[in-house]
């Protein structure tokens, strides 16, 4: 039997045996999990591992630590007595102990009290560890930078009560990438509650239907942007409590917004005292032993995805966030590093299929883990979210390699992701604005980069994400306008050609990326209004300053500043995109890429998109080809005054009638006026979606 992916892409046929072998490995793991009730039940291990209250109010603690010779649970609850609760070990290295209730039948370990695991390693040394399955850990910098585990077991009256169902899966994924900690305009760490109150309404008003939350999994080093995870089951306590995060997600759901977790399963922080590294005294418990377990660039540890208990830990982690916090899916970080033994370092991908296959290049165990993760989400769908209107669990891969079939179902021979990030697109835009004169922009290369994606594999397009905002780089707006943003963004200022150019190109770049670059779109928090400068977390090198570690919301709220115009355009783009459904439509038909005129024309979702990137030439009676005959009028004009434009087009008088003359490969044509540095979107007057 030929796999569906090989039918769709004949270039995969020589590698079908390897694709089938991956499927067989997934099947073998499922057979192993069957003895624990199957994949979904295996991934419910978070309900058994860690600390859990039993019906009789006793507390049972389980921890896998095969390299330890003794284990003791201790904490505030017993005065840190290291003799009272010695744990027993089974043949697989699973330690357990039960703490009986108090004499009056209450839970002996108080809510929000601190606990520790003391382990005796094989060399006879006693070490303290945070339980690996801790759901809340805290830091008291007045005492130590090392995190401490907390037993989170609030009384029923303090537990968050869910009010809203998860929304249906959006057909047009418009993603707002956000970081709770930087969401305050003040120079400090923001909170879950502040995000719920102040930021969610902004996101909803803009028209985004998905939020991708970064830096939620606990990380000891704030400046790691959340990518050096220390406690995988603990949500970051910097921003508040588990109940606060639940309120945030529930409120978003009430607004019809899907919420994704930026999950980091590609590596782990190398911290020992408050991480997983050397947890049981060995370097090979959760990770590969020796140099194989070290990421040469990230200075972090690499999971051994071929181990039964590692799969338990990671697969359960996914179900935990879905079931406990009602996350609607995941953006998997660092997928390229997982897929390949070389981690994508020092390797350029030419597109040759041999680069994506073979045990020499590919970490098959990691690929199989990702396939199992998607099989888990598929199994959990009817179990946790029954009903036709229930949203599906979404997944996005951060992969720069372009591995074929990454975003195809496991049953068809793929890895299972719904989307991949179009990581070449932001690189193209930054390179253009940094290195190339406007008059030398290559329309053909822009279009090629935006449309270069695999057949039947969906892509999330973006002009910039958090990666481009970090210190050492700058936001797109700052590359375009730089220091002029400090002095010339007032609506009362004299006209400034640098600002005018920057605002015009910022809108054009985002619209062409949104409408041509993929089947979904992503924006990083604040960039919708052209956030100035860069992002720099407090660290030793900047005097622990929060000055660049915040979002400057006052500039977009100030009606005397031009940031409002970029914000209004972004909102119009999101609302038009969702209304007309161009992201879920077939890929665009590009009818014109004129290098001399710097004009690009394409059609998608029954709309006609026209871009004039020329720095100073406007065109009257410019003939363009269109597929459908009729009368066309504007539904979006980047030059409109409310978007900071010059209002060079009279919308009331702009009615473009087609002629039955073939032009640029289209059956009809029409004549339009295209001012310089303007993007226009036309729809037929009789389009029922205009009603």
Curated annotation (Swiss-Prot):
Annotated EC: 2.4.1.18
SUPFAM superfamilies linked to this entry: (Trans)glycosidases, E set domains, Glycosyl hydrolase domain
Subcellular compartments: Cytoplasm
Keywords from the named record: Cytoplasm, Glycogen biosynthesis, Glycosyltransferase, Transferase
Cytoplasm listed as a keyword: yes
Chemical reaction(s) catalysed: Transfers a segment of a (1->4)-alpha-D-glucan chain to a primary hydroxy group in a similar glucan chain
Alphabetical list of InterPro entries matching this protein: A-amylase/branching_C (IPR006048), Branching_enzy (IPR037439), Glyco_hydro_13_cat_dom (IPR006047), Glyco_hydro_13_N (IPR004193), Glyco_hydro_b (IPR013780), Glycoside_hydrolase_SF (IPR017853), Ig-like_fold (IPR013783), Ig_E-set (IPR014756)
Catalytic residues of the enzyme: 333 (nucleophile), 398 (proton donor)
Biological process annotations from GO: glycogen biosynthetic process
Site entry (Transition state stabilizer), positions: 467
Intrachain disulfide bonds: none
One GO CC term, this protein: cytoplasm
UniProt binding sites for (1,4-alpha-D-glucosyl)n: 80, 116
UniProt key word rRNA processing: no
Pathway(s) annotated for this protein in UniProt: Glycan biosynthesis; glycogen biosynthesis
GO MF entries: 1,4-alpha-glucan branching enzyme activity; cation binding; hydrolase activity, hydrolyzing O-glycosyl compounds
Family membership: Belongs to the glycosyl hydrolase 13 family. GlgB subfamily.
Task performed by this protein: Glycogen-branching enzyme participates in the glycogen biosynthetic process along with glycogenin and glycogen synthase. Generates alpha-1,6-glucosidic branches from alpha-1,4-linked glucose chains, to increase solubility of the glycogen polymer.
Protein name: 1,4-alpha-glucan-branching enzyme
Organism: Yarrowia lipolytica (strain CLIB 122 / E 150)
């Amino acid at each position: 039997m030929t796999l569906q992916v090989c039918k769709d892409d004949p270039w995969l046929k020589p590698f079908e045996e390897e694709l089938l072998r991956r499927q067989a490995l997934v099947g073998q793991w499922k057979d192993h999990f069957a003895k624990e009730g199957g994949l979904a039940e295996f991934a419910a291990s978070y309900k058994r591992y860690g600390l859990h209250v039993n019906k009789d109010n006793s507390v049972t603690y389980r921890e896998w630590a095969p390299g330890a010779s003794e284990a003791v649970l201790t904490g505030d609850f017993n005065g840190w007595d290291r003799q009272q609760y010695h744990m027993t070990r089974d043949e697989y290295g699973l330690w357990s102990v039960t703490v009986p209730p108090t004499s009056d039948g209450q839970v002996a370990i108080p809510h929000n009290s601190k606990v520790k695991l003391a382990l005796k390693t094989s060399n006879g040394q006693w070490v303290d560890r945070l339980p690996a399955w801790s759901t809340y850990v805290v830091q008291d910098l007045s005492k130590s930078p090392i995190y401490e585990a907390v037993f989170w077991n609030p009384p029923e009256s303090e537990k968050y009560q869910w009010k809203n169902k998860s929304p249906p899966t959006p057909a047009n994924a418009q993603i707002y990438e956000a970081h709770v900690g930087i969401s305050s305009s003040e120079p400090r760490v923001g909170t879950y509650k502040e995000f719920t109150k102040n930021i969610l309404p902004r996101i909803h008003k803009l028209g985004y239907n998905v939020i991708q939350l970064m830096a939620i999994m606990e990380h000891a080093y704030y400046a790691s942007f959340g990518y050096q995870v220390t406690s995988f089951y603990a949500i970051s306590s910097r921003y508040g409590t588990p109940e606060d995060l639940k309120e945030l997600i529930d409120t978003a759901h009430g607004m019809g917004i899907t919420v994704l977790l930026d999950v980091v399963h590609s590596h782990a922080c190398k911290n020992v005292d408050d991480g997983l590294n050397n947890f049981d005294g060995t370097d090979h418990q959760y990770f590969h032993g020796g140099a194989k377990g070290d990421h040469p660039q990230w200075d972090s540890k690499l999971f051994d995805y071929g181990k039964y208990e590692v799969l338990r830990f990671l697969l359960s982690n996914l179900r935990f966030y879905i079931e406990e916090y009602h996350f609607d899916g995941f953006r998997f970080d660092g997928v390229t590093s997982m897929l390949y033994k070389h981690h994508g370092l020092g390797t350029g991908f030419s597109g040759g299929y041999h680069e994506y296959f073979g045990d020499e290049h590919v970490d098959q165990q990691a690929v199989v883990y990702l396939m199992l993760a998607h099989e888990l989400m598929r199994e959990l769908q009817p179990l946790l979210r029954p009903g036709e209107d229930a949203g599906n669990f979404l997944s996005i891969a951060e992969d720069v390699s372009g591995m074929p079939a990454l975003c195809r179902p496991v049953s068809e021979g793929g890895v299972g992701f719904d989307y991949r990030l179009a990581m070449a697109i932001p690189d193209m835009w930054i390179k253009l604005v940094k290195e190339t004169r406007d008059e030398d922009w290559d329309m053909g290369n822009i279009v090629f980069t935006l449309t270069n994606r695999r057949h039947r594999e969906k892509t999330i397009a973006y002009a910039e994400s958090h990666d481009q905002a970090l210190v050492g780089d700058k936001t797109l707006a700052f590359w375009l306008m730089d220091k002029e943003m400090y002095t010339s963004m007032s609506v009362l200022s004299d006209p400034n050609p640098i600002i005018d150019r920057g605002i015009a190109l910022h809108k054009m770049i985002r619209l062409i990326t949104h409408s041509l670059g993929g089947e979904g779109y992503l924006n990083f928090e604040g960039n919708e209004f052209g956030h100035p400068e860069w992002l720099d977390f407090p660290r030793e090198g900047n005097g622990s300053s929060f000055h660049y570690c915040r979002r400057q919301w006052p500039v977009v709220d100030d009606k005397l500043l031009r940031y409002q115009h970029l914000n209004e355009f972004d909102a119009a783009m999101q609302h038009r995109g969702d209304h007309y459904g161009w992201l879920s439509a077939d890929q665009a038909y590009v009818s014109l890429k004129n290098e001399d005129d710097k004009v690009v024309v394409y059609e998608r979702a029954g709309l006609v998109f026209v871009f004039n990137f020329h720095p100073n030439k406007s065109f009257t009676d410019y003939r363009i080809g269109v597929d459908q005959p009729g009368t066309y009028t504007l539904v979006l004009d980047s030059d409109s005054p409310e978007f900071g434009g010059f209002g060079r087009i009279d919308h009331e008088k702009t009615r473009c009638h087609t002629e039955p003359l073939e032009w640029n490969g289209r059956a009809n044509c029409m004549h339009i006026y295209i001012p310089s540095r303007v993007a226009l979107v036309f729809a037929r007057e009789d389009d029922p979606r205009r009603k």
